[in-house]
């Protein structure tokens, strides 16, 4: 899952 702040920063550190 690639979202951003919504996603878990630990799992998906994408902004």
Curated annotation (Swiss-Prot):
Cellular component terms (Gene Ontology): extracellular region
Reported tissue expression: Expressed by the venom gland.
GO terms of molecular function: serine-type peptidase activity; toxin activity
Domain of life: Eukaryota
Post-translational changes noted in the entry: N-glycosylated. Contains sialic acid residues.
Record GO biological process: proteolysis
Enzyme Commission number(s) from the entry: 3.4.21.-
Known regulation of activity: Inhibited PMSF, benzamidine, leupeptin, and Cu(2+).
Main localization of the protein described in the UniProt heading: secreted
Subcellular location(s) of the protein: Secreted
Record family assignment: Belongs to the peptidase S1 family. Snake venom subfamily.
Function as written in the Swiss-Prot or TrEMBL entry: Thrombin-like enzyme that has high clotting activity upon bovine and human plasma. Also has fibrinogenoltic activity by rapidly hydrolyzing Aalpha chain of fibrinogen (FGA), and partially consumes Bbeta chain (FGB). When administered intraperitoneally in mice, causes defibrinogenation, making the plasma incoagulable.
Subunit structure comment from the entry: Monomer.
Leftover remarks: Negative results: does not act on the gamma chain of fibrinogen. Does not act upon factor Xa (F10) and plasmin substrates. Does not induce hemorrhage, myotoxicity or edema.
Protein name: Thrombin-like enzyme BpSP-1
Biological classification of the source: Eukaryota, Metazoa, Chordata, Craniata, Vertebrata
């Amino acid at each position: 899952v690639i979202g951003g702040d919504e996603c878990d920063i630990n799992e998906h550190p994408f902004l």
